């Protein structure tokens, strides 16, 4: 993979009738078919009858749905041979037209040739006649976007650590002649160690010097001025502009360019004027002036940006340099020996690795080089469906590799630095104490498609982060001090606003694009319909009353691999945020209005995990759905986020919310709230007795979503939470011993908010905390009710 394989360049005009697939949207270079052995084998050892019922795809036991759309769904899965967690994206090829399939496979092909520690990585491709399965790593840190929503702007030291990784990864793509074209906060993921992973290569393409690209794609607030002008471009320069917007966003928590509609946004981008916050350093301001340059010819190259003073503050002896891709370790004797015990032949292993087949053999080899999943709360590795029976706590101690100097950052949550302890190909030593399951000889096929390809919308499928191939020390983590700072006006942006998700879209032809972007045609953008898979609200409110508006997610027309988190409440109602909290993917029941000062502001329809691609001619045919922006008030800065979040109102989250929705009496149903789980779950005191005192709260490593902490007994905390919920007329259902699913508001008035409250253990602080996690509803409505409840809790 170190030698770049030339990619066929897809004609930029060849994209009409494009239909996006959750994050995979551009070209047909068929991936290697999976071997016959890949027909869904099972792990023989340590499988109980319960786990036996779980569906399989290849060597992966599917567990939870973490994203779903019209043509694809994403499942959290576990590799039965190694026990590693992965994300499996299941795409129904029969629903895609030839152009969409071509783009889908181009994205897969591009992902195969990228090998950088800060870019998501593909593990395995399994293709059948009707379905494509993409196996990727699942990341637990969530999006940078969600991080900003929850915590506000980053301090420059923290932003620098992240931005160095972003620049390194993008420059690596450019040196391989690949342009991303959809760089934004939503497409930047964080792994368990808070390292950046760039995701969603659905709009990426190969570029060649002298040949211009002409597709206008990406999210408008991050789009370069030449795109708004309908000009052709080389490629890298549009990514450089987007990086400038990202840097501004990291440091300020708001966008440098924004508008109430596309016309206003276009005018501001073409002016190139943006507000410099008082707290921004001069060095950072100077770097922005190199990135956000109107003339693309004068815009700095990433090689020049790497040498910038701000980029290297604190790294004077390890100036950021272009990433040198290491030689792949294709002959790790320990991993190969383990695979032989699983039933793989040595010749088969060698052939798969040398040919880079991305089949079950290569995937197993790569996964063996990655650190095993960490189990909290004393969970045993032999439980559930794991085939890896035991794992010494020190099994990876000797596998730490030195991270590239330009990617080294320190972890702020503790005094000692913790390095990433694994590498995909320069694999760690595998301790002999770890035993793995033999590969079965007989292959059974279990179709996992019991669920229909739902039209239930999920929150954007995010992108699964994929393993780094060289070691990187952890980026700064969030500690308790960070939580406090989010409530501080000094570290929060302007009040009343909200950082909104932005739609990524495509105009293929310059004539169509030009028409769509003219002053008199700003309404053409409003004719875009909502994406086929709209996402549910997923932002996390700050830890307390904040004077800063929150980031509203940019919705892209191309989908993401997936965002990772832990399992969710139910199949079909999960999400991927850190802390194992579960999100319910579904259409948001509310149209989100952030500020009373902009009641009649039109809004971009909430996009989806797989973002629909829009073309110039399609713009004229689709109904109005205006681009949302902040009020055009002189008191608002150009970069302030004041966008409304809007979800499709076609349905409330099925399976869960039906019991909470207020019904209109005229529909023949009982008015008021339907029976709540609170009523059906029985007396809380009786339930406490029934479940016994042995149950313990789940342990969390981080305090990101903690509204409050206490030394009180968890059962007493749970009773206090119920008391406050009752006092605020909130409905709730006890999903687990210390987990409540809560609902407040009226769906008919678009004020319905759904969230989780969980009592968790914080072992590092020797305290218990209350974790809040929004599932649906506007970020402002959630923040209001969550803050009210948190303030009333007497813990």
UniProtKB/Swiss-Prot annotation:
Activity modulation: Inhibited by phosphorylation at Ser-219. Activated by phosphorylation on Thr-215.
Modified residues (Phosphothreonine): 5, 208, 215, 613
Modification after translation, per record: Phosphorylated at Thr-215 by STK11/LKB1 in complex with STE20-related adapter-alpha (STRADA) pseudo kinase and CAB39. Phosphorylation at Thr-215 by TAOK1 activates the kinase activity, leading to phosphorylation and detachment of MAPT/TAU from microtubules. Phosphorylation at Ser-219 by GSK3-beta (GSK3B) inhibits the kinase activity. Phosphorylation at Thr-613 by PRKCZ/aPKC in polarized epithelial cells inhibits the kinase activity.
Modified residues (Phosphoserine): 219, 382, 390, 393, 403, 423, 444, 475, 588, 666
Residue span, KA1 domain: 746-795
Segments forming domain Protein kinase: 60-311
CDD domains attached to this UniProt entry: MARK1-3_C, STKc_MARK
Subcellular location per the Swiss-Prot or TrEMBL entry: Cell membrane; Cytoplasm, Cytoskeleton; Cytoplasm; Cell projection, Dendrite
SMART domains named among the record's database cross-references: S_TKc (SM00220), UBA (SM00165)
Composition bias, Basic and acidic residues: 447-459, 661-676, 683-697
Entry remark concerning the domains of this protein: The UBA domain does not seem to bind ubiquitin and ubiquitin-like and might play a role in regulating the enzyme conformation and localization. Activation of the kinase activity following phosphorylation at Thr-208 is accompanied by a conformational change that alters the orientation of the UBA domain with respect to the catalytic domain.
Record-given protein name: Serine/threonine-protein kinase MARK1
């Amino acid at each position: 993979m170190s030698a770049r394989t030339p990619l066929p360049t897809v004609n930029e005009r060849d994209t009409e009738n494009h239909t996006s697939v959750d994050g995979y949207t551009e070209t047909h270079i068929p991936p290697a078919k999976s071997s016959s052995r890949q027909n869904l084998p099972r792990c023989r050892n340590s499988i109980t009858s319960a786990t036996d019922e779980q569906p399989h795809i290849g060597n992966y036991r599917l567990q939870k749905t973490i994203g779903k759309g019209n043509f694809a769904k994403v499942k959290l899965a576990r590799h039965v041979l190694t026990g590693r967690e992965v994300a499996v994206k299941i795409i129904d090829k029969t629903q895609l037209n030839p152009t969409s399939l071509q783009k889908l496979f181009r994205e897969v092909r591009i992902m195969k040739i990228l090998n950088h520690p800060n870019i998501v990585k593909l593990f395995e491709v399994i293709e059948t006649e009707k379905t494509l399965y993409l196996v990727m790593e699942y990341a637990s840190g969530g999006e940078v976007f969600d991080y900003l929503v929850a915590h506000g702007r980053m301090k420059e030291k923290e932003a620098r650590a992240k931005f160095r990784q972003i620049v390194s990864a993008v420059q690596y793509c450019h040196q391989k002649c690949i342009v991303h074209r959809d760089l934004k906060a939503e497409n930047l993921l964080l792994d368990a160690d808070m390292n950046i992973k760039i995701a969603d290569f659905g709009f990426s393409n190969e570029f060649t010097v002298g040949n211009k690209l002409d597709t206008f794609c990406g999210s408008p607030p991050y789009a370069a001025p030449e795109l708004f002008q309908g000009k052709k471009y080389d490629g890298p320069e549009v990514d450089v502009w987007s990086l400038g917007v990202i840097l501004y966003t990291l440091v300020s928590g708001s966008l440098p360019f924004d508008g109430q509609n596309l016309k206003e946004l276009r005018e501001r981008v073409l002016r190139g004027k943006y507000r410099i916050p008082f707290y921004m350093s001069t060095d950072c301001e100077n770097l922005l002036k190199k990135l956000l340059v109107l003339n693309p010819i004068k815009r700095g190259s990433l090689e020049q940006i790497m040498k910038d003073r701000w980029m290297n503050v604190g790294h004077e002896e390890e100036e950021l340099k272009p990433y040198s891709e290491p030689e792949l370790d294709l002959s790790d004797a320990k991993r190969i020996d383990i695979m032989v015990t699983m039933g793989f032949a040595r010749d088969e292993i060698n052939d798969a690795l040398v040919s880079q087949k991305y089949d079950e053999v290569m995937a197993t080899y790569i996964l063996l080089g990655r650190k095993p999943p960490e189990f909290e709360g004393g969970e045993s590795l032999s439980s559930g469906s794991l085939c890896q029976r035991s794992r010494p706590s020190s099994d990876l101690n000797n596998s730490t590799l030195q991270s590239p100097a330009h990617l080294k950052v320190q972890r702020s949550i503790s005094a000692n630095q913790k390095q990433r302890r694994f590498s995909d190909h320069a694999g760690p030593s595998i301790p002999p104490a770890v035993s793995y399951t033999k590969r079965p000889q007989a292959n059974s096929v279990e179709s996992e498609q019991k669920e229909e390809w739902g039209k239930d919308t999920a929150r954007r499928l995010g992108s699964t982060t994929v393993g780094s191939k060289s070691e990187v020390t952890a980026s700064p983590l969030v500690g308790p001090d960070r939580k406090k700072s989010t409530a501080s006006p000094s570290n929060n942006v302007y009040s009343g606003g909200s950082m909104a998700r932005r739609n990524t879209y495509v105009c293929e032809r310059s004539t169509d694009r030009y028409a769509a972007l003219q002053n008199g045609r700003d309404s053409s953008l409003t004719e875009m319909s909502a994406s086929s898979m709209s996402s549910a609200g997923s932002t996390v409110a700050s830890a307390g009353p904040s004077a800063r508006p929150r980031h509203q997610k940019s919705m892209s027309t191309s989908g993401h691999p997936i965002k990772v988190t832990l399992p969710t409440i139910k199949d079909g109602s999960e999400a991927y945020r850190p802390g194992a909290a579960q999100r319910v993917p579904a259409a948001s029941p509310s149209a989100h209005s952030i500020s009373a000062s902009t009641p009649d502001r039109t809004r971009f329809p909430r996009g989806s995990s797989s973002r629909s691609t829009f073309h110039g001619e399609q713009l004229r045919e689709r109904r109005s759905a205006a681009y949302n922006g902040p009020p055009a008030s002189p008191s608002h800065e150009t970069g302030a986020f004041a966008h409304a979040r809007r979800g499709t109102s076609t349905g409330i989250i099925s399976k869960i919310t039906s019991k909470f929705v207020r019904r209109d009496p005229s529909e023949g149903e009982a008015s008021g709230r339907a029976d709540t789980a609170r009523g059906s779950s029985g007396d809380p005191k009786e339930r406490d007795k029934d479940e016994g005192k042995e149950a313990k709260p789940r342990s969390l490593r981080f305090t990101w979503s903690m509204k409050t902490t206490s030394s009180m007994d968890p059962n007493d905390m749970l009773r206090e939470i119920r008391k406050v919920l009752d006092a605020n007329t909130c409905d709730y259902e006890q999903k687990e011993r210390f987990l409540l699913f809560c609902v407040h508001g009226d769906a008919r008035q678009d004020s319905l908010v759904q969230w989780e409250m969980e009592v968790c253990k914080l072992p590092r602080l020797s305290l218990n905390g209350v974790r809040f996690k929004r599932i649906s509803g506007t970020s402002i409505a959630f923040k209001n009710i969550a803050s009210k409840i948190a303030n009333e809790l007497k813990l």
